[in-house]
Amino acid sequence: MTREENVYMAKLAEQAERYEEMVEAMKKVAELDVELTVEERNLLSVAYKNVIGARRASWRIISSIEQKEESKGNENHVKKIKEYKCKVEKELTDICNDILEVLESHLIVSSASGESKVFYYKMKGDYFRYLAEFATGNPRKTSAESSLIAYKAASDIAVTELPPTHPIRLGLALNFSVFYYEILNSPDRACNLAKTAFDDAIAELDTLSEDSYKDSTLIMQLLRDNLTLWTSDVHNMEKNQDGDDDQNEPGM
């Protein structure tokens, strides 16, 4: 199939909510080693986001059930749950490794514009973060380090190439701050990053283009929601150092 035909099939698969097939179609486009259009880039991102998102949701539900069964002392159930969770983790690992290979071998090397470089390095950071979410020990440490390097690479380019109100720069700040909060357990750094991104965007709100107004303001709202949640968590931890360290899921 031609590039155009694969893009059409990806759109068709998206409409039919057959995201695995959407991934396959967009992988073929990515493997042409050409600069993707904004539309193609977004189709690729949506395809993988849906495929990984379903498994991430499954993993969270299974983990929650596992905790409940462990607290009840149901050893037989816990054994079955752990086996099932391993199956989901294998799927998560395969999907993450798949897109990371596409990014490393095709997309990052073929990207010419600052915008696309930020987009792809952000994606790289995201998928290493997803690996770190369920990994333990050394694999978690390695994934977290790789995620941090990718997010920093994206940030360095974003600061010089994209305005503070650009939705890709704001989306990067959102996800990078979530990484600090959830993976590195650094609420202060998470809050500082989110607040700086939000304040910088507010200061230049009058320069926001009509095209990206909706996307940018939505991400700014998510940054503010997370800040509200995280600052209250930090405040509670300071008030009660020996308290429960359960953390709410930040809005993303």
UniProtKB/Swiss-Prot annotation:
GO-annotated molecular function: myosin II heavy chain binding
UniProt source species: Dictyostelium discoideum (Social amoeba)
One Pfam family in the UniProt entry: 14-3-3
The family this protein is said to belong to: Belongs to the 14-3-3 family.
GO CC, alphabetical: cell cortex; centrosome; cytoplasm; cytosol; extracellular matrix; nucleus; phagocytic vesicle
Name listed for the protein in its UniProt record: 14-3-3-like protein
Single GO BP term: response to bacterium
